[in-house]
Amino acid sequence: MLRVYIPGDAAVYRNYARAVRRAGAVPCFTDDPADCGCLLLPGGGDLSPMLYGQTDIACRGLDPARDALEMDLLNLFTSAHRPVLGAYRGMQSVNVFFGGTLVQDLPGHSSVHDSDRLHSVTAAPSLLRRLYGERCVVNSSHHQSIDRFGAGLEALQWAPDGTVEALRHRTLPILCVQWHPERLSLPGAADGQLLYDAFLSMAKL
């Protein structure tokens, strides 16, 4: 059975673990990541802007130890051509790992009164488009976004204001979304479990 490494506390990331189990895989928090076949980078605070050559003007919840861990994990999994799925911060980590930059503060996309915003996205031909159609509605609770793309990365979904909501690597098995597919689907919004099911099914091959 596919083992999916999730860096972090199992209690904090229980929604991710639930989605992985529902997709027929095993979430791993304390195992050796080298023994896992897939990496799932979850949401969280902002990455240090020093990683992409900027000074801090609007970052929140910086955690240099986590930054270093995720860069090491990405090096491990990409070197072995193992699948990587990123959500929210996970997508930003992937972009920075490949040399990209971030918008440090993006108005209009963060949560309101602890509730996710909902907005539409438009998808390029891809797995996401096959799952959700050319247009769908996703949740949104981020205040940073992709600015310059890292090497080998390309956009798959965009918000109406042009914000990149999903990306993939052209040659490596990497897929990331800026929204939160692990959260229970809200009425009228895309069912994120479909993404976990499809990506982890491909990762098992």
Give short role names for the model-derived ranges.
Residues 90:
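Conserved SAM-binding loop
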